Amino acid sequence: TVSLAAVNTLPVVTDTTPTTAWTEASGTGANTPVVVDSGVTVTDADNTTLASATVSITGGLQPAEDVLAFTSNSSTMGNIAGSYNSTTGVLTLTSSGATATLAQWQAALRSVTYNDTSHNPNTASRTISFVANDGTLSSVASTKTVSITAVDTLPTMTDTGSTTSWT
């Protein structure tokens, strides 16, 4: 007699290029977020849905500056919702009832952005790790580097229009 038992396999998250570049805005305008990896893929040999995923700043975290976010779009991402913890640098994505499909998870992970809110950013690179969970097992982390480029902003002086006198 031969007995076969099903074995749950890990989901797999695969990133594309190893580095994404972020550059500080020139002047005093707001910095622009960059997509961390627009080509990231998610697979799972024995599941068509996943329960959750985390995207974490696992290297170089600057809690007062760094922000991870994602664009929630129910037509392409189902019921995936997210929350970011700035202290830990972790963006947690969840699917109520673990019903979001692999394609929906892939769309959500592809929409994750990094931004630095400082106009004097720490220029150390950030390591961003993607992990998917099928409800039982978590994938091995897939990591990306975000390089940080600061821009020297010219000082500004404002003329108040008043006359200055000296006595």
Protein language model annotation of sequence segments:
Residues 1-167:
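Extracellular glycosylation-rich, acidic/polar low-complexity regions of adhesion-
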